[in-house]
Amino acid sequence: MEKYRKTEILQIVEEEGVEFIRLQFTDMFGTLKNVAVPVSCLEKAMDDRSAIDLASLNGFAKEEETELYLKPDFSTFTILPWRPQNGKVARFLCDVCTEDEREYELSPRLILKRALEKAEKQGYTLEVNPECEFFLFHTDDDGMPTTVSHERAGYLDTSPIDLGENTRRDIILTLEEMGYQITSSHHEIAPAQHEIDFAFEDALSTADKVMTFKMAVRTIAKRYGLHATFMPKPRQDVNGSGMHLHMRLLKNGRNVFTGENGELSTDGEAFLAGILGHVVGMTAVFNPLVNSYKRLVPGFEAPSDVTWSRTQRNALLHVRKRRGEGVDLELRSPDCAANPYLLLALCLEAGLDGIRKQQKAPKELTEDIRRLSGEEKKQRKIQSLPDNLGVALDAMGQDLLVREVLGESYVAEYQKMKRREWKNYLEQVTKWELEQYLYLV
């Protein structure tokens, strides 16, 4: 994103007739929050003097630190294109700070910045290209979201079959107006499912843009009378929505993952091995919802086992060669419910842990894993991903690297809140149970 000085922002605000400023930040679970201030308070806000009471925000603030401060990142300043042209609205993404101007330890953005600074000291820069999938559903007569769509389009279909094409195009034009580089978009496999892909960018900018992207997509969809959802598996009978991450690691401007003859390098293999070694413990962050695990099942093009491959695109980690760009690693398990700051921090730290230890990757998957029986997987020592949120939370607490990267306080609070969510789910009496047992028992 373009870097702005304070004086430049004040000038733009005056020239563009901006009247409101949104001070946005991300909570520990990846939800975008904001405080709106009138333009008369802009200078005060830019001097980090916007206090927020976080006592009612689950898990974010400790009892002794319920009042914190928002520190705008000037590089994230943008005017929101979908707001009225009279009385425009702009926004900053903010870091959360304590009264003594320290960045707050439970701030997800701080956790990623800390990981990036650590990598930078070793000469590394992480670049990421996310592929974000979502559904566009109809709303009911009261404007509430449904899982209904009259569309029957499939992979790469176009209009008039793809009924969401105009919405998707408007989303992209809006994002480009906000400084995004969009490399492609298309209809996905399931009816009413869409994908928009970003260009490679540094990890912090990517995480910031993912947060803004979700807000923009939902806002533009609403203009068309549609509800955009990033829920991983809103319908049982079709593919779910993920957020595949393409990653490359640079050192002195060179792609570390690309070795001789354009193949995966030794350090690239070690980075890959580091992620595979910790992915079970990181899954509660990559896939943070009860619903996330209904996507990670065989038969719907989502990974359910800890595998890597150059040729099998259903593997958890796919090694991809791009013409003229070298090798990148595609991680296929995360979904858009994940907090992108935590997601990228964990990927980077786990990968660098692999490089530091010069780890070797497990045996490469060279055939379709769907053809392997459970016994064959066991013989090949292929580990499964957690199959529910409860198992994932247990694994999270047992992974020392996850606890080190996120911090013990963060992990404890995250587990507490998510276990409450998991327990609440387990206590529900579902429609399936009633259909199966009410008549028979």
Segments (PLM) and residue ranges:
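Glycine-rich, acidic/polar active-site loops that bind/position phosphate-bearing ligands
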Residues: 1-441
